[in-house]
Amino acid sequence: MRKTVIAGNWKMNLSEKEALSLAHSIKEKIPAISKGRISMIFPSTLHLAGVAKILQGTEILVGAQNVYPSGLAAFTGETSPEQLKELGVKVVMIGHSERRQFLGETNSFCNEKIHFLLKNDFIVLYCVGETLMERESGKTFEVISSQIREGLKGIHSHSFSNLILAYEPVWAIGTGKVATPAQAQEVHFFIRKEIAGLFLGAKEIAESISILYGGSVKPDNIQTLLKEKDLDGGLVGGASQKIDTYAGLF
Ligand code: G3H
């Protein structure tokens, strides 16, 4: 039985006051939040400490949107997993399309980060997805295949229990244009097939890993999406920054 995971990515949004106030409101709403799901919030790095403190001891996991794969060292502007641990942060998002597109993050750098994090007992939410141009030129599966094969290269079978995947078609992010359930299902199925092909015995892992869909997810479309066989949750951007949507989404 795969776990249903709903993750909220606040990206580089909200002032400190807004982020902390949203965290307090989420805490109050926890009784209304669906049971039996894993809920995660990813505030900006600057707000991690404050949000993690507010949600400490609750069922909501607080995660980081990025990390540098090193212990404490001279990497100006970066954050070490060691520093995240101190805050009680156990989940890190890797490979979000905004980092790939605007910050030049490659599959191989994602792979380095994933190795480092899994070795240090973090849960990793690894994001993949094609751009509109890639989809329109018939490259969707080729792109996803490289992101899976290169991003997850050399990951040991026993570490997969700490991995969650997210499929986010870039053309559906923040555009209001949601992938149809059939479009999302087709790619989620493909992702599972790619994972099954990673190494001998990976078929079982592919069946048990949670794959979230991201791209304009809202309370009014999440249920339809979750009806698809290979969709196990949502990675929510815009809607996760509004408290009103929490009871319907998380
Ligand atoms: O990480 C979240 C995604 O990029 C989706 O963002 O829900 O605003 O489309 P969105």
Swiss-Prot record:
EC number(s) given by UniProt: 5.3.1.1
Coiled coil: none
Record: residues binding substrate: N9, W10, K11, G174, S216, G237, G238
Active site: H96, E168
Subunit structure: Homodimer.
Function: Involved in the gluconeogenesis. Catalyzes stereospecifically the conversion of dihydroxyacetone phosphate (DHAP) to D-glyceraldehyde-3-phosphate (G3P).
PANTHER family named in the record: TRIOSEPHOSPHATE ISOMERASE (PTHR21139:SF42)
Name of the molecule in the record: Triosephosphate isomerase
Organism: Leptospira borgpetersenii serovar Hardjo-bovis (strain JB197)
Gene name linked to the record: tpiA
